Amino acid sequence: VLDEKKRKENVDFMAEMIGQCALFQPKCLVLHPSSEPIADSIRAQRITNASRSIAYLKKYADQIGAQLCIENLPRTCLGNTPEELLEIIKDIPGVKVCFDTNHYTKGTTGHFVETVGERIGTIHASDFDFVNECHWLPTQGDIQWGKLMHALEGIGYEGVFMYEATKDHENDNTRPTPERVVETFNKIINDYKNQK
């Protein structure tokens, strides 16, 4: 937010929440860099404010031993390109990126991985139509999962591959069953192997 008093209140609340997370001993904490909509006229100031807030919250994540990751977001949100996301975190050592495959609508997943590289700290995996976020099971949209897996291998990524899919697009957008999650994950692995 632009209002400094409200920004400080929000960040203090988030710092308190991070402190309470210590009970669960998280390895990673994922934060969004903004809400939306964000007009172009205030974007630069919002980026500055987000960077300040993240730097402040990083100290609290460090206190509980958690890796702080900032998630890419779609539409007019901050961090809607890998370049902008890196701009937000560039002066904050140790902060990484949560790559949400379903949020990057301005390019390919390969471009995102190549640009962010080793700063990818965790992944939220779901598929979409390259227009807007859909949260479909992976392999049900337009992402080329085998290519994405090779790109991740190319940067040495060995972290979490967390499904964040809420819809089984091939079954009338019903909630995915565990069996369907396994089925789509096996498709990803087979696609990866077939591209070697």
Residue map of PLM features:
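Active-site acidic/histidine proton-transfer and metal-coordination neighborhood
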Residues: V1-K96, K106
